[in-house]
Amino acid sequence: MTTVLESTAPAAGAGFVTMPARIRDQATREGARVCMREKRYGIWQDITWADYWETVQLVGHALTSLGIEPGDRVAVHAENRPEWLFADVGTVAIRAITMGLYPTNPAAEVAYLLQDSGSKILIAEDQEQVDKALEVEADCPDLQWIVYLEPRGVRDYDHPKLMDWQDFIERGRVHQGQDPGLIDRMAADATADDIVTLIYTSGTTGPPKGAMLTNGNVAFAMETLIADGGFYNPPPTVDDVVLSYLPLCHVAERAATTWTNAQAGVTIHFAESIETVQANLKEVQPTLFFAVPRIWEKVYAGIHIKMNAASPLKKLVYGFGMKLATRIGDELVANEGNHTAKTRLLYAIGYPLVFRALRDRVGLRKVRAAGSGAAPIAPEVLRFFFGIGVVIYEIYGMTENAAVATVNRPGRVKLGTVGEPQPGTELKLDAATGEILTRHPAVFVGYWNKPDKTAETIDDDGWLHTGDVGEWVDGTHIKIVDRIKDIIITAGGKNISPSEIENSLKASPFIKEAVVIGDKRPYLTALIGIELDSVGDWAQHRRIPYTTYRDLAEKPEVLKLVQEAVAATNDRFARAENVRK
């Protein structure tokens, strides 16, 4: 079965609009309007569309002055901040290629990524990232310059390849005066086939591979994800606010913030750090919010921790609210996310009593559209958020198809699935293996310098082989069973998807990580890591003393607590899928 929905998004080579052109157009229309904010010294600083476009041009000129030409690679190694976007779009504006690194990449991985991509310039955030680069720069023959954003600890370094960001921007200003028509000429020469970014995918069975996305890929993805088939209803506008906190070198964050910002004009707020996401959420109160399951699970666990520590009266009110939320969630799930008279009545009771304060406390009071992707999420977590008025739409996509595959849409939600194919997306299941295959104009053009791996991933007919096993639900929605390589076959010949069991276990506020094992074994076992905050709080309220994480995890009471969570999960699955140890 092959499913395809009509799309108004452009074909890869037809009428595409580049990212720089979208920024330019936004700046031309509403240059004085704020497009992003970052926090400095405790105060949110505004950056307008005019500021954005001006800095993008200066970056493009600065890169050109340093010898960067179309097709060259520019690497960015920084946390989420405005300069990441300036560097990214400025690079694309001169038809060069952006390559992002995770802030947590150690020096050895930095060396590999710089070597494999052949990056000529690295834009590094601070002393930590500069030190990594200097440690390996002798092994990176293509690397010519290291531009640092934060001078603290670096300004006194004496190295010929180092350059301060402000000096870099001033260099661009000088070059702009010498060649003011550069950006316009580059824009006129841009094609749909120009590679704009290398996004390196995790190398679980080998070194990371750089997925090449083009102007045409990104244009189709922006139109499809945001205008045509996203989970937003209505589509994003200039009045919407997003929080940027997931790594910008990942396709999900590009789609959720950078592309949405350029396409729809939403305002980006950059989280101060990954550790402050919860506090920044509460402060910013975004209207659109995308998160990976781990974030949703952490918010879910945090709510339970706070309620367990509340006064008896608050616990009573909270308990009543959660009963309402459960009834609302169950009703919404049964009706594909559509409200009924019953759910509206229950929500009208629960919102002023519990839900409003609860949503405000976790930073989700204003959220009108929420998404989850990049990994499976437990249905129990989704039901909870449904019940308090935050409907989370599961999304499925990957780097190799620019995050465009399937999505649950408002009013057509099927819990446990990743939704329907996006408009303009062909999707089918391999008859022999059940592998999900997709085909559309945002499918990447291949892996950088790895034609053999590309041939293994895209077949002669243009179908992308995702590596995920799926199954149709009601002939319209796709359910992800698991990665092909992760399917467990027990000694009894039973095929089991470990991710479903693992996600159910992690729905417990007391379990942080779970790995199910059972290939060629008579029964399943699980390695479980407890959630220190919630279990520690639980132990403290029961006056159970402990000294270390290990000491806490080995307490008989905690072992019993974990076993109860395992038993609750086992009740949801067939006997062959039960965790025995």
Where are these regions (language model features)?
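Conserved AMP-binding A3 loop
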Residues: 46-50, 166, 188, 196-223
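Conserved ATP-binding/catalytic segment of the ANL
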Residues: 421-430, 434-490, 507
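ANL superfamily adenylate-forming
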Residues: 128-192, 303-357
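Conserved AMP-binding/adenylate-forming core of the ANL superfamily
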Residues: 35-89, 106-111, 164-169, 215-216
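Structural core segment of the AMP-binding/adenylate-forming
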Residues: 61, 65-66, 93-171, 561-570
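Core catalytic subdomain of AMP-forming adenylate-forming
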Residues: 457-475, 491-516, 560-563, 567
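Conserved AMP-binding/adenylation subdomain of ANL enzymes
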Residues: 219-244, 248-355, 366
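Conserved pre-ATP/AMP-binding loop-to-beta segment of ANL
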Residues: 31-34, 163-166, 173-200, 207, ...
